[in-house]
């Protein structure tokens, strides 16, 4: 399966990639449902989850929305770069939300649902809250608010399907993506795969490397990259590793290495043709180099591509190169109320991620049939008590 159009929601990834840079021109296409109100013409955004392992906490996304204290951010020598502004924020620790609000000029709220009706879009920026996304986003989806939900979306297919149900029933677009889906190498590799199909090539296999050192949070970097290139027609998956998290916790084991294997049941892409022969894509996940490589083997030879390392003292170009396309994808969804990836594609990505997790945790890295994953199987959270359930009433 592949990113596809679902109803009137467009999701052609190449169209999006080529138009994302001009997305601010789409403001006039906003519906009345999402039209910002008040003095500002900017899209009003609410953010939640500002603590450990949050893209907002590390100043990755926030300065792309708001100028810190109304001025140019000391780490970011730039002015406004998007058509969005963070107006409200929430965190499980109200003091942290207050500090964020003071820094970026927005309003901190005490309850997770206090932003409903006050924002045009919601960004769920954390990782530790993933186990509770299904509850945290419910009131926003029920209100029809477009929601960006950070990877890996859900820890069970039951929760993933509930989020999708709420999205569909309330016409509330959702987005779950990763910056490695937007890098140039992913686009070039996808186009190359399509060309191989048009040329009648037979795929023999592929090998890849990924920066990630822990499956639960950053393993999706590599997984989502591969799915952006080859699609989601994965029949079986395995994950061999010595752990799954970056540190030891009461529920987690420390991970230093991992190997992901995707068994594709052939390959088919609209307008490009198909290849019926099954093949395996293998990816070595290591720590800590921030790069991705891919080599594709076919019946006429090899083709490879590499995403150069982006580590270094100057994080400014790295952050913009990697993270800005994701922020623009949020803006596009908030403005147009269209989904880039279909609900089916989001569910496919989540199912493959969870099946690999199950392979590691319960089957010593054996290949598991993706379709056989029970909806109620739940992957562990490294911080199982991160959210106090009493906040949900």
Residue spans for each PLM region:
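C-terminal helix-rich "cap/oligomerization" subdomain common to oxidoreductases
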Residues: 18-38, 114, 122-124, 333-393
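Conserved acidic residues
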Residues: 87, 120, 204
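A contiguous active-site-proximal alpha/beta segment in oxidoreductase catalytic domains
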Residues: 153-223, 361
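Rossmann-like dinucleotide-binding domain that binds NAD(P)(H)
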Residues: 90, 204-278, 282-289, 344-351
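C-terminal substrate-binding/catalytic lobe of Rossmann-fold NAD(P)-dependent oxidoreductases
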Residues: 263-265, 271-326
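N-terminal Rossmann-like dinucleotide-binding module
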Residues: 27, 31-103, 194-197, 227
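Beta-loop-alpha module in the N-terminal Rossmann-like domain of NAD(P)-dependent dehydrogenases
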Residues: 93-95, 101-166
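N-terminal secretory signal peptides and thylakoid transit peptides that target proteins
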Residues: 2-23
């Amino acid at each position: 399966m592949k990113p596809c159009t679902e109803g009137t929601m467009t999701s052609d990834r190449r169209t999006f990639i080529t138009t994302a840079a001009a997305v601010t021109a789409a403001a006039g296409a906003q519906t009345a449902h999402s039209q910002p109100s008040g003095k500002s013409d900017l899209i009003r955004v609410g953010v939640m989850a500002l603590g450990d392992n949050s893209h907002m906490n590390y100043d990755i996304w926030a300065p792309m929305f708001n100028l810190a204290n109304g001025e140019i951010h000391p780490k970011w020598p730039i002015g406004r770069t998007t058509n969005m502004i963070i107006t409200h924020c929430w965190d499980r620790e109200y003091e942290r939300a207050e500090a964020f609000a003071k820094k970026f000029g927005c309003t901190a709220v005490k309850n997770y649902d206090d932003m409903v009706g006050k924002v045009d879009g919601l960004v769920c920026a954390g990782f530790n809250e993933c186990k509770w996304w299904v509850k945290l986003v419910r009131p926003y989806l029920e209100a029809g608010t477009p929601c960006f939900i950070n990877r890996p979306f859900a820890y069970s297919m039951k929760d993933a399907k509930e989020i999708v149900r709420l999205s569909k029933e309330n016409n509330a677009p959702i987005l779950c993506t990763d910056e490695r889906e937007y890098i140039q190498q992913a686009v070039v590799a996808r186009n190359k795969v399509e060309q191989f199909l048009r040329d009648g090539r037979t795929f023999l296999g592929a090998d890849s490397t990924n920066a990630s050192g822990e499956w639960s949070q950053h393993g999706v970097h590599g997984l989502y990259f591969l799915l952006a290139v080859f699609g989601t027609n994965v029949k079986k998956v395995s994950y061999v590793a010595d752990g799954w998290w970056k540190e030891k916790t009461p529920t987690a084991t420390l991970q230093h290495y991992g190997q992901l294997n995707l068994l594709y049941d052939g390959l088919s892409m609209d307008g490009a043709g198909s290849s019926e022969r099954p093949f395996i894509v293998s990816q070595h996940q290591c720590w800590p180099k921030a790069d991705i490589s891919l080599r594709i083997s076919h019946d006429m030879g090899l083709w490879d591509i590499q995403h150069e390392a982006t580590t270094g003292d100057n994080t400014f170009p790295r952050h913009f190169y990697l993270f800005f396309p994701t922020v623009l994808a949020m803006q596009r969804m908030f403005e147009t109320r269209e989904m880039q990836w279909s609900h089916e594609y989001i569910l496919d990505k989540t199912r493959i991620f969870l099946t690999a997790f199950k392979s590691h945790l319960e089957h010593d890295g054996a290949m598991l049939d993706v379709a056989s994953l029970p909806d109620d199987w739940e992957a562990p959270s490294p911080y199982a008590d991160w959210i106090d359930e009493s906040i949900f009433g």
